Structures are given as C-alpha cells and as structure tokens.
Amino acid sequence: MSAIENFDAHTPMMQQYLRLKAQHPEILLFYRMGDFYELFYDDAKRASQLLDISLTKRGASAGEPIPMAGIPYHAVENYLAKLVNQGESVAICEQIGDPATSKGPVERKVVRIVTPGTISDEALLQERQDNLLAAIWQDSKGFGYATLDISSGRFRLSEPADRETMAAELQRTNPAELLYAEDFAEMSLIEGRRGLRRRPLWEFEIDTARQQLNLQFGTRDLVGFGVENAPRGLCAAGCLLQYAKDTQRTTLPHIRSITMEREQDSIIMDAATRRNLEITQNLAGGAENTLASVLDCTVTPMGSRMLKRWLHMPVRDTRVLLERQQTIGALQDFTAGLQPVLRQVGDLERILARLALRTARPRDLARMRHAFQQLPELRAQLETVDSAPVQALREKMGEFAELRDLLERAIIDTPPVLVRDGGVIASGYNEELDEWRALADGATDYLERLEVRERERTGLDTLKVGFNAVHGYYIQISRGQSHLAPINYMRRQTLKNAERYIIPELKEYEDKVLTSKGKALALEKQLYEELFDLLLPHLEALQQSASALAELDVLVNLAERAYTLNYTCPTFIDKPGIRITEGRHPVVEQVLNEPFIANPLNLSPQRRMLIITGPNMGGKSTYMRQTALIALMAYIGSYVPAQKVEIGPIDRIFTRVGAADDLASGRSTFMVEMTETANILHNATEYSLVLMDEIGRGTSTYDGLSLAWACAENLANKIKALTLFATHYFELTQLPEKMEDVANVHLDALEHGDTIAFMHSVQDGAASKSYGLAVAALAGVPKEVIKRARQKLRELESISPNAAATQVDGTQMSLLSVPEETSPAVEALENLDPDSLTPRQALEWIYRLKSLV
C-alpha cells in the first residue's frame, strides 16, 4: 500500500481499514462493507489485474483519491478460488458490530486468512488431489521437511539428507504453499514455485517447535510419535503448525498426531524418476495417460487421494503388501455390490476437517448423515468376506447410529447452502424454534383473513394486503378508489396507479413477525453450533472411520482393476531379482488400438544387467518403463499386468530416460543427463532398479561411448544394481563377453525394402543392425536425403567395415584411439623457419612457445 504520512488526515473508516491492513501487509485484505468486499490502494490495483475486475476510485481520504475494487459477498468463493490458484493469500475482514448501535465505523476484524495451503472449503479444493501446506528448513547436517493436509489433519515430517532427496520430496508432495526461513540457502530448490512464504527465523526454533507440538497433541514429550530425535524435521513442523493456527484463527482438534516418514520404509524415487514414469502427471503436465489414470477408478474423492499417496510412496514392508494382496483377492467377488454403496459415502474426510474447524456448512452435515446411512449396508456386505484385514476395516468403520439419528432429527432433507439463510434445522427438533416459526409462517393466513375483512368493511374491491422487503406490510388500494380510504389508513407509499397504507394493527403484527423471524434465525444458528459440540467429541472415531472407508475404496478399486484388466498377483522373493512372464505396460496397453505384445524379463543375482538394443520406435523405452511400473504396482500391494511375476527387495527406482534442456537453470540436455546419471551412480545399491536409456547421446560419439561403457561397467561390477541399459552403441553388446552377470536382449524388427515392421518382441542376443535409415524414411524424411544417407553409410562401412565389432574395453579401445589434436606449440614450430630468425626473434619465440605449452 502507498505510504501514508498523516494517519489522522484520513476518515475514521479509512483509519480502521489502515489499522487492519497494517496487520496483514503482505496479503490482500477483503474489507466487508455491506453486500461487498472492498479492496483499497495497492490491494485494489493487484486484485483488478488478478481477477480482471474494474478498478475505480472512492472519494478522497487525506486529500487523495482512493483506488478501489470490490466483489459481491455472495460470489466471494469464486474469486477466492481464482486467487488461491494463483498462489495468493487473502485476509477476510467481516463486520462484527451492529450498525444500528455503532457510533462511528462498524466494528470489524479479520476472521480468517485464506491461503493456498490452508484452504478447507469445498469450492476451493481439487477433490481428487491432496492440498498440502509445507515447511522446509536447512542446517549443516541436511534438511527438515514437514507437510500438513489441513483438510484431513494428516501431519508428516521427514529429514532428507541431501539436495537430491529434498528435490524428490518436493516433487512427490507438490505443496500448494511452502514456508521457508528468511536465510534459506538453497533457493534454487524452490524458486519458481507458487505459494512461497518467507518466514522469520524465530518461527523455526526447536524449543518453540516442541512446545507448540506438545500443546497441540496434549503431550509432555514427542517420544510416542517417534519424532523426538528429528530436530530438523521438528523445526519445519513447528513453523508449519504456528502458521496454520495463525491463518485459521481457531483450534485445530483434527490434527492429533504427527508421523515420521523414513527413507527405509518406502521405495525411494527421485524427481526425475517420478516425472519419467508418469505416475500421476504426464510429461506435458496433464493427468491423461498416466498410471493413476488407469488404476484410479475409485468412487470417493478421499479414496482417490489415498491411492495417489500409495503410488508416490510404495512400501517395502512385505507384511503390509501381503495383507493388501490378500484383501484384493478376497474382495474381487464383491466389487459390484460394494462400489455403488461406497460412492454414496462421498468425501467424509474433508467434511470432518470442516467440522473440526467449525466451518462445516448445512449441506456438509447432510452429506455426513448420508454417509452414516450407508454404513449398515457396507457392514452387512463385508460381514461375509473371509479375510481378517477386511474384518479389521469393517470394525474401524464403526456404525455411529446415535449420530445418524441426531442428524436425521436435526437437519432437513435438503438444507440451504448457508445457515444464515434459515430453514436448516428440521421441525420437531426444538420446541421453541417451532413456536417462533409458527408465528412467522402464520403471516400468510393472517394477511388473507385481514384482506377479506377489510374488503368487506370498506367495500373496496381493489384492496389487497401485501409485503415487500423495503416497506414491510401494507394495504394497497387503486388510485381510482384511494379517495375512499378510511380515516385510520396512514399513507406509506405512493405508486403510479395505487396508494399503499398501514394501520396500527398491521404495524403491530409486522413488528411481531419480524421479531419472530429474527429470533427463529438466531435460535437456529445457536442450535447449529450446538450440533458441532455434540459431534466433535466423536471426531477421532469419525476420522478413523473415514480412513477405513478410503482404504476400502482403494482396495475394492484395485480388486476391480485386477479383474477387469486381467492382472495377476505378484510373488515376493528374498533375493534381488525380477522375473516377469508376459509383462505388459499398464498404460500403453489401454491406449493402443491393437493387441499389446507382452514380453518376458529376467533379472537375478546371476543376470543383473540387460543391454537392450534395437531400432528407435522398436519399444525399448516402453519395455523398460513397464518393468519399473510393474515393480511400483507390486510394491503398493496391487496386482500387476503380467501372466506371472516374482520380485525381490527393491530400495530405490532410478530412471535416466530422455531429457530436455533445463533452460531455467541454464543446463543443456547433456548436462541434465549427466546430473541424473551422477545421482544414480552415487546412490544406487544392489537392491536398486535402474533404467538407463541412451546414455551419452548428447555429446560426441567417442565421448558418449566412453561414458556409456564406463557407466554400464560401474553399475554391473561395482554397484551390482538390477539394470536395464538401452543403447544405440553396438560396441556395448560386447559387455556380456567380459562380465558374467550381463546379458544382451533386443527388440525385433523386420525390414523389407524401404519399409520396416516393428515386432515389439524382446529376444535374447544383440540386434543385428540399427534400422536408423528405415525409421527416418518412416518419419517422412525426403527420399533424396535417405538415398544420400545410404550412399554415405556404404562409404563409411567400407572405410571401417568392422566398426561394430571393434574391441572396446578398459585396456584397448581401438574405436576410441583417435589421434590427439595437434598442440598449438607443435603447429607453431612446424611453421617456423629457424634460419630466418634473428637472435632476438628466437628468444621471443621461446617465450611464446612456452606460453602455448
């Protein structure tokens, strides 16, 4: 806002505004004035641009016109949604005083702050995506990271050890709002993100954090949560919790615990891997043709969000995985009956969060009632399922018959949007409310009786009784008969063709009705708040029920997907390895218009690396990605697209597949590729699954081949990771001759004249040729260019007929033994005529040559 030099020069209302704005200088302030929220000064200018609304001026204050923009209060949610989507935060300032009794400006205060990471309103949230508030902290030992989903109460912290792991966490969680300390060093990690909030250092103090968290959970220490020895994570969590409390302006009873996320509990995937595998987002940034788009046929929003969390955090605990597999198997015959009932449950998780924040609307309570009404049917269907995990879920679900009965008695079948609209509480629930309503609702009968009586008394056939919001109740007589109005009729309003009157009896009744309506609405609001008080003691059990219902939705969905898409149950083995019979790519097989060619895969301690060759477009990348996706699906407990799968322990999945220039960071394609490769070579273990596609293609042939050879050698000999290594360097097909746990496979193709047929079938052994020219022809490269390329290829092959079979290893690499570039000093000496030099010139040349060496 513009600097205001003389505060006292402003009107009292603007002084009130400026005081409130000074408390929230960084964010937009919606200042309630009657039926509008107004914005002033710089806020008005920003809002007019962000929301595409008119920028006007309001009179003058301190001698200057005031820039102003406004939005109607009844449409505020739409405008808030637009601002939140742009990463903006808004302070909502309401009138809390009574205009009738106020001297000077009506009392106002900020009642809530809407920020991208703390929204819980249904209209502002993406229903099938988590909306996370996060905080990041860094010290000399690493990072601390905490996330909170305020719409469910899910509170997590972790301590990423290095920059790569931290980047992967940001990619996985994708927070809507991120808090960071004012001295945060790694700004390049978070630059460009929406919803960045710079916070003072003291908010990250460890002692303050412990105090805040213990106060929130009602505990003396944090040992029971397993986070006591995570100081960096606690620093982030403390700042995050304080921010959530500051913005919500209320208690947060649904946040009742915090969980530590440890690397060893889940399969680690870095940011590049999540991007390349297109788990929930494709490479173009959309949701189409992703793994989630195939697997997610859940029928509740909370189930959809849980499935996506599973996909981004595959678990390594085989006990949990076997339990999920057993449940999916047991539910396969019940999906048709369960899914229609589950669909009626809706988003109970987020409704409960709004209940906890006391912002639940009447329709939220109606939906909660509807969810409770489904529980008996769900429990009855699940009773016959022979599975201990299913029965455990059934118990967690509960019944809540008393709460269902309460809401059936208290809330009408189809309530209005807001409690202030009235008519929310059902008749029969409260005797006093029914009496006030009867008085208000009896107005129609009274007015009809009054109209009949007055017509008979006056003999005026145009007389009628009515009501409008401005003038209240009135008796109307046409202009032609108005001169006959009785003497006790007092004129209230003159119209073109009629006169309107009031009589003492009608005025008295009007006061009585308006009083009864006001009292009914006030009592209704009070009863509505009391409903929160009756429901909130059950919040913990209700949250457990919502979690169980979401998990049931996910497992029923995976059972349906397994049956519909012909998936099989994978087997977990103790030793590293992956054996797949007739494996398929879960996404590609759904979008193809022709049958998908299934392929086998065998990786074991004796066969740790496959060198994959074959033509471009032959299916190398698909084959590699399908292996990673099958492994990922197995480790969320899902069935997988194959005839049979045996899979050993996996700690990490890495992919180095494709690359593009990172223009924002000034990194070339090759630099991006090498950075990702370095991350793999530093962090992969013998239990990692590594996908390497076309390493070294971003530089010269010799450099690229050298790097590809050395990387393959390191992965096979030193790291011993389970590796799929696709390459166009045929020299690498000699690796199996030098290393016993490396094997060649290739994708088959048939060439006939200028055409090529991709068989998409994986065969043992190396590919016989590259088919590059045939693929170029298929892509539409002009025939004269293809013809010239064939001619050039024959020339090159005649010069080096055995290029593909050249020995390339650590001691002898004839293909790489290219002549070194001539030194500038040698070139200078060759061009020098010593006989023509004077002694002085000879001395100068010695110094010059010295500088060239």
Curated annotation (Swiss-Prot):
The keyword Cell inner membrane is assigned to this record: no
InterPro entries (alphabetical): DNA_mismatch_repair_MutS, DNA_mismatch_repair_MutS-lik_N, DNA_mismatch_repair_MutS/MSH, DNA_mismatch_repair_MutS_C, DNA_mismatch_repair_MutS_clamp, DNA_mismatch_repair_MutS_core, DNA_mismatch_repair_MutS_N, DNA_mismatch_repair_MutS_sf
MF term (GO), any: ATP binding
BP GO annotations: mismatch repair
Keywords linked to the UniProt accession: ATP-binding, DNA damage, DNA repair, DNA-binding, Nucleotide-binding
Domain of life per record: Bacteria
Binding-site positions, ATP: 614-621
PROSITE patterns attached to this UniProt entry: DNA_MISMATCH_REPAIR_2
Family: Belongs to the DNA mismatch repair MutS family.
Protein name: DNA mismatch repair protein MutS
Organism: Shigella boydii serotype 18 (strain CDC 3083-94 / BS512)
